[in-house]
Amino acid sequence: MARPIESPSTAVERTLLILEAAGQREGGMSNADFSRKLKIPKSSASYILRTLEQHGYLRRDQDDGKYRLGMKVLSLSRAALSGIDVREAALPIMKHLVDQIHITTHLAILDHGEAVYVEKVEAPGFIKMDTWIGRRMEVHSTAVGKALLAYLDSGQREAIIRQRGLKKLTPHTIISVPKIMKEFERVRQLGYAVDDEENSLGCLLYTSDAADE
């Protein structure tokens, strides 16, 4: 059966709606799910889904057949962030936070599966921390890394964990994939992440994801 002819504007609108819907459903969506939710004919949804998958914007799970956001979307997100001076926007908030709680604060982003500090505000008189702008850290053992990964699609989290592995840095480091996945869900529920001597002995750190504020 021939695919129904759609106007360019309709096709673009449906493509954007599919991407937005995929981003809102962490467990993934099937062709039928998209068709039902967005009121799009299954044949049209199937064509758009295959095209997005071919270009890396969606990925299809071979086990359940559901579609989830692909890594290409993450690349676009990174490009969008680079066009905005995140540090400039965050710095006044960070300074206010330091004034309120008198603890050194950091701003970090996710880059190639690592957490990278892009800004730091040191609290006066506070114990100096061995951190610096540009420092790269593991995502499974740091509070900031957990916060960054927790709000990604589960497929993206799994891909990063597979790529990076779960290195044991202290006796408290989580090195079990099921346990770290549960930890990410806990972060999403609580709204903050904790590093309880998992990256470095003697250090207890808390992090909140600014994107969730």
Regions found by a protein language model. Give the residues of each.
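Amphipathic alpha-helical effector-binding/dimerization core
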Residues: 63-163
